[in-house]
Curated annotation (Swiss-Prot):
Name of this chain's protein: Tubulin polyglutamylase ttll-5
Gene: ttll-5
Family, as annotated: Belongs to the tubulin--tyrosine ligase family.
Domain TTL: 120-478
Catalysed transformations (reactions): L-glutamyl-[protein] + L-glutamate + ATP = gamma-L-glutamyl-L-glutamyl-[protein] + ADP + phosphate + H(+)
One GO process term, biological-process aspect: microtubule cytoskeleton organization
SUPFAM superfamilies according to UniProt: Glutathione synthetase ATP-binding domain-like
Region (Disordered): 594-618
Example of a GO MF term: tubulin binding
Binding site for ATP: 278-281, 291, 293
Length: 730
């Protein structure tokens, strides 16, 4: 161990010079940089003898960039970092704001309000297998420079397709990647359904939110028996087969509604696969006689322990033609029974919502507009959202074991990963939500004004949850070689024990756990294989705790659904054991229990209400309460409103129920002006490296040639008479 006060070189960002100093002097410099205790990056770089890694937001002696004037626009120019969430702290991490897009256009009066900080620190991002205009616009509007996909040292990496888990081992502690390893366990349709079905076989009807399903070709025999059984059941009841089909068939790895069709027999199923064949839900809840589904945006910042958020703003996508199960609708199957926007926008009946003020116009509504419609129908919309939150948490828990195992192996540093999922949910007549699929990198296209407003806010809040560190490029360049050397040496030292630590049987033990096997017995089987490749698990856990506390002030319009008050007691009986660290329970104690204790100590009202809640539920064991809770979540006919919910459960979920009112709010405010589309970025703010700029130039030429060839091909295919008429007019 090195002595603490041995003189060494310390970089001072105030003077841009390196001088000889001691660790004590370095810590003093950290105070000048306002390095907070929750900045976990200090721990990594302290081992590399780099103390002052965080760049200051603004030195005390820096002069104002914009001279004060009497106009409101110029007065606004003094606020360089603005957030919709007033609780956010902006000293160590970048604060993203949807307001920044207003100042990135050519005609912006205050052009450097948000870009100056990113440009000064030379923050960078790259996009791989994605060309989302919204992501590029958001990053450029905060001063980020776009790099080529081959650059390994960028601050933010945005992927549009699955990343190989081994590539995540190269992530540095200051980098942010929008994916977790093995998240395809959730986003591939067959794996999603199989994971939830496995959890259902272990924990029972608590996971009853997916329809009956089969995966071809490996389950062809079971599927054939299912077709025969369904036909017999319908014949015995004197009914007819559902039109367009009793089963709906989807490719397991497709999106945007591609390749979907209906089936009533094995003859309708092609031999090639794999395909997901699931029971068609033929009694959907209708809005103005139209079928719909919900797009719910979910952010995850950690899988072990699980930290999950649901965005308070979402979308309701309506079918473009009225719902009809008769054979007369055969000519418009897809526009009646499918709700995918990419399909229905091609229908002649599709109505676009071009208004910013009307959230329930056309065939794409906001989530809040649909929930207000449900409330006007006399239904409990907030209880519906609690059931959707429950569905989301259980879906994430069903893959937690797989993702946690991969994360231990491939994520060297805490808090480098985050992910945005798009949950597609169908609601039936009993107001029971059913999970259809989960989308990896959900569409961020802004085809309508409400799309632009909602998704711009969504991405700003998502990046705030990611906590992108404010690091000067000089610091990164100086630290990276030493850190990579340390990582490589750790890799070589751990290679000798890889066989023990990566035993695949350890990861699969829980999947094969028989129903009724006690966890204490199961734990004994996996203790020997629970060692992680990353040594300091406790330090990583402490970092996750600090980041989770920080996220609470940076979440914007996200609602944390796990962990929060009551979640540990309700969900721990349906959670798999991931090791003897108990990170989920400990995070709940750190983030929820201690916070409640601190808040209740100064409020007699809070303590009295807490006492009444505990006394009313003390007569029931925690596992009995959990069973009753999951019964309430699944049996929507029996518990159709909050008044029908037993008092013991109502006291637990009442804070959730109150918070669910955030989903029903309008996303626009009267008197406010909103941009109807993404701005065109001015050239001075569209920062790109040379290689990245060359890539876009080449692509621009290729697209122009492709467009020209398509125009020539269409012209050659025109009828001769039409060409003659056009020539005559000319």
């Amino acid at each position: 161990m090195k002595p603490k006060n041995v003189p060494r070189e310390i970089f001072n960002p105030f003077t841009n010079k390196t001088s000889l100093g001691t660790r004590r002097e370095g810590l003093f410099l950290c105070k000048r940089l306002k390095l907070r205790p929750d900045n976990y990056l200090e721990e990594y770089c302290a081992d590399l003898e780099v103390i002052d890694i965080m760049a200051p937001i603004r030195p005390a002696d820096e002069t104002e960039r914009c001279p004060p004037t009497s106009t409101s626009d110029d007065q606004e120019a003094g606020d360089y970092l603005v957030s919709r969430n007033k609780k956010s702290r902006n000293s160590d991490y970048m604060l993203f704001s949807s307001d920044a897009l207003v100042h990135i256009a050519h005609d912006a009066k205050v052009s450097e309000k948000y870009t100056w900080l990113g440009e000064r620190l030379r923050l960078t991002f790259k996009m791989m297998r994605s060309d989302s205009r919204l992501i590029r616009t958001m990053c450029h509007s905060h001063g980020f420079m776009q790099c080529s996909s081959k650059n390994p040292s960028v601050n933010v990496i945005w992927m549009g397709a699955p990343v190989k888990s081994v590539r995540m081992r190269e992530l540095m502690p200051w980098q942010r990647l929008n994916q977790f390893p093995r998240s395809t366990e959730l986003t591939k349709k067959d794996r999603l359904y199989e994971n939830i079905e496995r959890s259902k076989s272990i924990f029972g009807e608590s996971f009853d939110f997916i329809p009956e399903f089969y995966v071809t070709p490996r389950e062809n025999r079971k599927m054939e028996n299912a077709f025969v059984r369904v036909a017999k059941e319908i014949a015995a009841a004197g009914g007819e087969l559902c039109f367009p089909g009793e089963f709906i068939v989807k490719p397991t790895n497709s999106r945007q509604g591609k390749g979907i069709f209906f089936a009533n027999s094995m003859a309708d199923i092609p031999a090639e696969g794999p395909l997901l064949v699931s029971r068609y839900l033929k009694d959907p809840y209708l809005v103005n006689n139209h079928k719909f589904d919900l797009r719910i945006y979910v952010a995850v910042t950690s899988f072990y322990p699980l930290v999950a958020y649901v965005y308070s703003e979402g979308l309701a996508r309506l079918a473009s033609r009225p719902y009809d199960t008769s054979a007369s609708s055969a000519d418009s199957n897809e526009y009646v029974h499918l709700t995918n926007y990419s399909i229905n926008k091609n229908s002649t009946s599709f109505v676009r919502n071009e208004s910013m003020s009307s959230e329930d116009l056309g065939h794409k509504w906001t989530l809040g507009a649909l929930l207000r419609y449900v409330e006007n129908e006399g239904k409990d919309a907030k209880l519906l959202m609690l059931r959707i939150e429950d569905l989301i948490v259980k879906s994430l828990l069903s893959i937690q074991n797989s993702v946690a195992t991969a994360s231990r192996t491939n994520l060297r540093f805490a808090c480098t990963n985050f992910e945005l999922f798009g949950f597609d949910v169908l609601v039936d007549q009993a107001l029971k939500p059913w999970l259809l699929e989960v989308n990896l990198s959900p569409s961020l296209a802004c085809d309508a004004p409400l799309d632009s407003l909602l998704k711009t806010r969504l991405i700003a809040d998502l990046l705030n949850l990611a906590c992108v560190p404010l690091l000067d490029r000089k610091i990164i360049d100086s630290v990276t070689p030493a850190l990579r050397k340390s990582m490589n040496s750790q890799e070589s030292e751990s290679s000798e024990t890889d066989d023990l630590e990566l035993d695949p049987m350890c990861a699969k033990t829980l999947k094969r756990r028989p129903v009724g096997l006690k966890r204490s017995v199961l734990n004994k089987k996996i203790v020997s294989g629970s060692t992680s490749l990353i040594p300091n698990n406790e330090k990583k856990f402490d970092q996750i705790v600090r980041k989770a506390e920080l996220e609470d002030g940076r979440r914007g319009d996200f609602i944390r659904v796990f962990p929060r008050n009551g979640t540990w007691g309700m969900y721990s009986p349906v959670m798999e054991d991931l090791g003897n660290e108990d990170f989920d329970e400990r995070l709940f104690d750190e983030v929820v229990t201690k916070k409640n204790t601190k808040n209740s100590s100064g409020s007699s009202k809070a303590s009295s209400s807490s006492a009444s809640a505990s006394s009313s539920s003390s007569s029931m064991h925690i596992e009995d309460l959990s069973d009753l809770f999951h019964e309430v979540m699944m049996q929507c006919d029996k518990y159709s409103s909050i008044a029908d919910v037993p008092i013991e459960i109502r006291e637990i979920i009442s804070p959730w129920y109150e918070e669910a009112s955030e989903y029903t709010k309008k996303i626009t405010q009267e008197g406010e002006t909103y941009a109807c589309k993404l701005p065109v970025i001015r050239s001075t703010a569209r920062l790109r490296t040379k290689s990245c700029a060359e890539f876009y130039e080449v692509r621009k030429v290729q697209l122009a040639k492709k467009k020209e060839s398509e125009a020539m091909a269409s012209k050659e295919n025109e009828p001769i008479v039409l060409q003659a008429v056009v020539a005559k007019r000319i």
